[in-house]
Structures are given as structure tokens and as C-alpha cells.
Amino acid sequence: YIGLAISLEGTKKVRINWGRECMRVIHESSNPNVMTHAFGVGVKSVLDNITVTSTDATSWVKRAAYGMIAVDDKSIHVSEVMKAKADDRSLSQQSRALQEDVLKRIKQRGFTLEELEQDSGKRAEFNILDTLDWVAKLEPHNTTFKNGLGW
């Protein structure tokens, strides 16, 4: 295994470019099939643009603790505390179409907006389900790919 610190400071574009450069160097090395682990990378758009064997992240639980839910690659504030804050990530500040999409996903996943506003544990569950939905859509880059969390 090679561990990669892709969660650098900077934009998603910077992290994607760094990850791709790492992949290029590995591909041109004497061991191009080595397994790779991306430390602390939970941003789906970054992971969609690099090829690693595994990754770990705490973004799902951090978002929940800070009053946010994950919807695709967006963090949306829903907690009671954050509702009062004038923030462009607050659900109430989103377009009507996005609000409707988020409310639909909340219902589909078996939650209510009210419980997500009040309960960080429920937000964490919601965020895990968002990640699992994304994982289910992944296509393996190699035959050793394992689509699952191991439990």
C-alpha cells in the first residue's frame, strides 16, 4: 500500500490535480499495480476523479455535528441553530428546486426535516445513507474492487 495525503488545503481542483499526479507517478513506477489509500478524502467529486483502492473520512460525522446533511457533494445546513444563521448553505437559502429535491430525499430515506433539524445522530445516519447511495453507483476500476464497507 501507498498512503496518499490528498486532502491538502486548497480547492477541489487542486486536490484532484494532486491526486492525478500521484496516480501518474505510480502508474509509471516499477509497481504500477500497488494499492493506494487516500487519507481523509470524503469529497465525492475528488474521489470520482482519482483511482484509489481505499479512503477514509470523517466528513459525514463532522457535517452532522455542525448541523449539516450531505446531498451528493453539497453540505446543507438544516439544524435549528444554523437555520437562524444567514448562510448560503442553509436549506432555506437554496433554490426552490433544490429545496424540493432535498425534502424528497429526506422522505425517501425515512427521515423528517424536523428530526434532522434537531438530532445530530439522525443527520449522521442520513449522511451515511448519502455516501452508500454514491458507493452503490461506483464502477470498479479493477478486478480487486470491493463495493462495500466490510460489515
Spell out what each predicted region is.
Residues 9-25, 71:
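Active-site-adjacent beta->alpha loops and helix N-cap segments on the catalytic face
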